[in-house]
Amino acid sequence: MSGDTGPPKQGGTRYGSISSPPSPEPQQAPPGGTYLSEKIPIPDTESGTFSLRKLWAFTGPGFLMSIAFLDPGNIESDLQAGAVAGFKLLWVLLWATVLGLLCQRLAARLGVVTGKDLGEVCHLYYPKVPRILLWLTIELAIVGSDMQEVIGTAIAFSLLSAGRIPLWGGVLITIVDAFFFLFLDNYGLRKLEAFFGFLITIMALTFGYEYVVAQPAQGALLQGLFLPSCPGCGQPELLQAVGIIGAIIMPHNIYLHSSLVKSREVDRSRRADIREANMYFLIEATIALSVSFLINLFVMAVFGQAFYKQTNQAAFNICANSSLQDYAPIFPRNNLTVAVDIYQGGVILGCLFGPAALYIWAVGLLAAGQSSTMTGTYAGQFVMEGFLKLRWSRFARVLLTRSCAILPTVLLAVFRDLRDLSGLNDLLNVLQSLLLPFAVLPILTFTSMPALMREFANGLVSKVITSSIMVLVCAVNLYFVISYVPSLPHPAYFSLVALLAAAYLGLTTYLVWTCLITQGATLLAHSSHQRFLYGLPEEDQEKGRTSG
């Protein structure tokens, strides 16, 4: 890939850009095959005018990306936020979705302008040690997300079978369904995208049904949505807000979206085509995330109405006096506030609104788990290929990710109870929030580089907004760690936490350092890090042109 160069030489080294290839030839997919094996052509229309035909051609990557906003981890976070805070945290959901859209916009822009995904660009610009550590953190995020999909699917099977399928059985079934989706991929890219659109529609209909039957108070709902306040809130509500952010803005999804947009044929030698692609991908992502926001809103509002300040005894009585009385014992007979999870959530909906509500909830939960399976597979494959240049088949990639996810999950399902399984879901949401800097910092760094992005580099407003997101996330994560450490069960855990915290802070500091270089702190650009100012050194430019 060729492009403009920065200053001809810096310290005897010539630097240059890898962006904007001179020809529109699409990159070839690796022999193992990926989502990018097929390229979608963009129809020719009158330049400078909006075209529904073109929007339809660009539609697909944004909806696949939006599935990460609707996985079982999000559903769990939504219902717990409703149960813990009622409608008070709806504004957090709204603004987390907006911030997520801003991050995904940067991811799509990087893929369109450079023709490379975030993992590939990280491989070219970061030294080996930070690059490997960064790859490991994103793999951890992918496995954590896959564990949530396994948990959600297993609970859905248990609810649909009235408990006849045990949790461990549901976990094992997810091994089969993960490979089933690989066969769907063989029917073509557009059909695969349409299938995931169908699953999103199922979620919208099922959770929308729950919203209609629950009839949440609209006045209080609108107040919670548009007034950013939380009167009477304490640490539980704040930790729940952290969970919402971690569930909505997922690290691996930023890497995923930067790859998905490469499935459209865009002539990167023409600035007008790049600008047009950026516009249509932004419109599509906005539509997709608006749909995901409504679905999350449905869930949070339903449980804010049905569960807020509900006691275990009250929940027991409701189920004991319903047609689902066999489920009543899952609620302890005490006056403590219900600690709801996605299993109990389905049960109480069935007790309140009839068995149909329980089964419809389970179908929506199943759709959430299944839709996330394939996108997680793609994210893992793209990240591995980008960072390490290891090109595995999707079969091998699914086997690796799902094996890592299933082992701890099935052990919990066999030897512990449902509450431990749901508690793991909560912990995984917080994990996603803790790992978020390892996606946001790189995407902010590279989309702010004129040597890489040319005139499509972030402007001042975009830099300020995205940097503010980063500061907010880091502050919230720091608060969580400070709040969590005193609750450790044994002093020996402090050493482990200290070691992990040191590694975490070290990698974060390095990423902040390189990010500051692209934001204008040129004095930090020593030695090999001048590439963050001027682009790749001459000896690395050929690698940049041929990689990917």
UniProtKB/Swiss-Prot annotation:
Glycans are attached at residues 321, 335. One of its GO terms (cellular component) is plasma membrane. It is found in: Late endosome membrane; Lysosome membrane. It comes from the Eukaryota. Keywords: Endosome, Glycoprotein, Ion transport, Iron, Iron transport, Lysosome, Membrane, Transmembrane, Transmembrane helix, Transport. Residues 1-55, 103-139, 185-193, 257-284, 367-397, 448-463, 514-548 are cytoplasmic. The chain crosses the membrane at residues 56-73, 83-102, 140-160, 165-184, 194-214, 238-256, 285-304, 347-366, 398-415, 427-447, 464-485, 494-513. One of its GO terms (biological process) is manganese ion transport. NCBIfam families: nramp (TIGR01197), Nramp_1 (NF037982). Macrophage-specific antiporter that fluxes metal ions in either direction against a proton gradient. Localized to late endosomal lysosomal membranes, delivers bivalent cations from the cytosol into these acidic compartments where they may directly affect antimicrobial activity. Involved in iron metabolism and host natural resistance to infection with intracellular parasites. Belongs to the NRAMP family. This is Natural resistance-associated macrophage protein 1. It comes from Bison bison. The lineage of its organism: Eukaryota, Metazoa, Chordata, Craniata, Vertebrata.
